Amino acid sequence: MAQKKGGGSTRNGRDSESKRLGVKVYGGQAINAGGIIVRQRGTRTHAGVNVGMGKDHTLFALVDGHVKFANRGEGKKQFVDVVPAA
């Protein structure tokens, strides 16, 4: 005869790994060409001047410079630019 009750089972105990999304370089900070500025799902932030967009909507710098965030355009969308280093 068992001395302990059966442990039973659970349907919990799983979770997906975090994707580490978000802003990686903030406004006013220096960045090198190719550096990631924002990792995102969809275009929450749009690519502005001297900024490229990867196939997963990651925004990255095309030139060395400083990051600048701005709201502009229809509905005041958020854009990110890289101002080239002088």
UniProtKB/Swiss-Prot annotation:
Amino acid composition bias (Gly residues), ranges on this chain: 1-10
Listed GO biological process terms: translation
Highest taxon listed in the record's lineage: Bacteria
GO molecular function, one term: structural constituent of ribosome
GO cellular component, one term: cytosolic large ribosomal subunit
UniProt xrefs under SUPFAM superfamilies: Ribosomal L27 protein-like (SSF110324)
Keywords: Ribonucleoprotein, Ribosomal protein
Keyword Aminoacyl-tRNA synthetase: no
Disordered: annotated segments: 1-21
Matching InterPro entries: Ribosomal_bL27, Ribosomal_bL27_CS
Similarity-based family: Belongs to the bacterial ribosomal protein bL27 family.
Annotated protein name in UniProt: Large ribosomal subunit protein bL27
Organism in which the protein naturally occurs: Ralstonia pickettii (strain 12J)
Protein's gene: rpmA
